[in-house]
Design a protein with these regions (language model features):
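Structural motif
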Residues: 49, 263-265
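Short, basic/aromatic-enriched C-terminal tail that caps enzymatic domains
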Residues: 255-257, 265-286
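A structural signal for short secondary-structure junctions
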Residues: 239, 260-263
Length: 286
């Protein structure tokens, strides 16, 4: 069932809640791939009813980013969702989500602003305001759908940590379910932005996973010094790569690590041409 308005979603949610059914939410920006489908599968298995939102959220894009070019494939997304057992595909317009405010100026919108300590690093360092937009839209989706469970991929691990913090601090009655990164056989993490990559770019993009897997292998052999682990990365980089960051952070609060341990996440971001890609790996069983 494809719906475009908040009122339609709320009507169905009222019916489901009255019947005592559990509701799962999978927030997406569309251009669905097997990574999204793994989240959807978990939601359908765990919940009585599943809602997938398809919304390219304008307020989480920074100036000069790919808002206008971001792939929009609603018909294909709807078919994938229906085949996966999704009950509602919620595909609102920006006006439906934000009224006239977003057209006039972001100064007219009420935002959910996550703690600066969580957003002034990694992706938030170069994408100023990005996580304000993410937290605002996810909070709105939680208010609209009122899910019991919400499913997010671990590929956007910083986002996942920030959203968990938001849910805890604002006492939002939803349980966030983290979902494992889905990779191509080559090791490349699935992403909607992979559609921008040429075949040559895809080969160069393998540097992300190769660096992370190599760091994990070195850690498993007993190397814990972050500087030493970082130095192992450079042999995988060439002139096609513009490394934005390679950082070791705590899995709970994103504090920077000097010595790696089982609660460490290794984060990487790099550009290949104009395409920015991110990935991460946990060094322990988290």
């Amino acid at each position: 069932m494809l719906v475009h308005t908040i009122a339609e979603v709320r009507e169905k949610i009222r019916e489901w809640k009255k019947a005592g059914l559990t509701v799962g939410l999978v927030p997406t920006m569309g251009a669905l791939h097997n990574g999204h489908l793994s989240l959807i599968k978990k939601a359908v298995e765990k919940c009585d009813k599943t809602v997938v939102s398809v919304f390219v959220n304008p307020i989480q894009f920074c100036p000069g980013e790919d808002l206008d070019k971001y792939p929009r494939t609603l018909d294909a997304d709807k078919e994938l969702c229906e085949n996966a057992g999704v009950d509602i595909v919620f595909a609102p317009s920006p006006k439906e989500m934000y009224g006239e405010g977003h057209i006039m100026s972001n100064d007219f919108l009420t935002y959910v602003i996550p703690p600066f300590f969580y957003v002034n690093k990694l992706c938030g360092k170069s994408r100023v305001g990005h996580f304000d937009g993410v937290c605002t839209v996810v909070n709105k989706l939680f208010n609209i759908v009122q899910p019991d469970f919400a499913f997010f991929g671990e590929k956007d691990r910083q986002q996942l940590i920030i959203l968990k913090k938001m849910v805890k601090d604002l006492n939002i009655p939803v349980q966030i379910i983290p979902c494992t990164i889905v990779r191509e056989e080559s090791g490349l993490a699935l992403s909607s932005r992979n559609k921008y990559l040429s075949e040559e770019d895809k080969v160069n993009a393998l540097a992300l996973s190769k660096i992370l897997f190599n760091i994990k292998a070195c850690y498993d052999k007993g190397i814990t010094d972050v500087k030493a682990l970082t130095e192992t990365a450079y042999s995988f980089l060439n002139e096609a790569h513009a490394l934005e960051y390679l950082e070791f952070r705590d899995a709970d609060d994103l504090e920077e690590k000097q010595v790696a341990d089982g609660n460490t996440i290794v984060f990487i971001a790099l550009k290949i041409g104009n395409v920015r890609l991110i990935d991460n790996i946990a060094l322990g069983n988290i």
